[in-house]
C-alpha cells in the first residue's frame, strides 16, 4: 500500500468511527421517539405536554443528525503533543464522553481556520479530508510548524499542500 493510500486508509478508520457514532445516535433518538409516541395521548394535561415536548426534542435531534450526513468530517488538527482533533459538521463524543469529532463552530476548532505558519500556536499540521458519501477520497496537509517531524512525513506521503509546502521547501535549503 502506498503512503498516500495508507493515509486514506487511516482517515477512513476515523471517518468510519464518526459515522458509526452518528448511526448509533440516530437509532437511539428513533427509539426514544418511538417510545414517546407509543405512550399515546392519555394521562394528565401535564403528562401530555411533557410527552409532546420530548417528542419535539427527539424529532429536532433526528433532523439535526440527518442533516449532517454529507461531509460529516472534513478536517483534522495535529498538535505538538501528538493529539489529533477531527473537525466536522457536528460535535460527537463516544459513549464514554471521549471526543470523536469537534463541531466546526466550537472554540476548539478555531485553529483549523485561523492557524498560519507564522502564528500556529501548538498546531503542527492541518489536514483537509475530502469525502464522497462516507468514503475518504482525498487528503491534503498543510504543515504549519515547518520544524516539526510531520513535514517529512507529509512530503513523503504526497499530501503536503499550501503555504506549508512552500515553507518546507524553502527551510530545507
Which residues fall in each region the model found?
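Extended, charged low-complexity regulatory segments
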Residues: 1-172
